[in-house]
Amino acid sequence: MKPLSLYHPALYWLRVWQKRLFRHIAWHCSSKRYARPATTSERLPYRYLKHTSKLIRKLGDSDLALQHNKVINLKLAVAAIDGVTIAPGEYFSFCRLVGRPTRQRGYVEGMELSFGEARTGIGGGICQLSNLIHWMAIHSPLVVIERANHSFDPFPDDGRVLPFGSGAAIFYNYIDLVLHNSTDRSFQLKLKVGETQLEGELLCDRERAY
């Protein structure tokens, strides 16, 4: 049986509002220390790992303009997270750092996955950034506390680098990617939207022990 919220748009958005409110309350009442936006351009000295993913991908007869809009959205999301340091004991929340993607903040319509299909939505495409961060996290000592997978793979044959199962869906603010640094080391995310690739580095304050 489908949830009642799926039978009428008003019920759906009421449920979304409720979940967002609950998440804001949880953030406000939590004693967890969350990583804050970077205030300097300094880099931690050691690279722990690096990864990239292709920016423009073809999905059947989909509008490539949505792919180019995705790049605009990614640049805004990258600017919010680039340089953030996750100190020992701290938590990283994608949604807390990026905030709600709205037209007023410069986000445009891109492709997003919803209810098992590709559709347009403001801020669409920023999940590519959460996918990349999640991939780096699972190949590091960072612990994934919260992560939701996408319902299907829109690009099964177009030069996929990140396995589909490694994705991390985002829907502000209650479908989030949350990491925890349970180590005694600091980690830093350095991110960049290049010419053809979304580029990510995970840096550390100590050399990696191989």
How does the language model describe each region?
Residues 1-210:
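Well-ordered beta-sheet/strand-loop patches within structured domains
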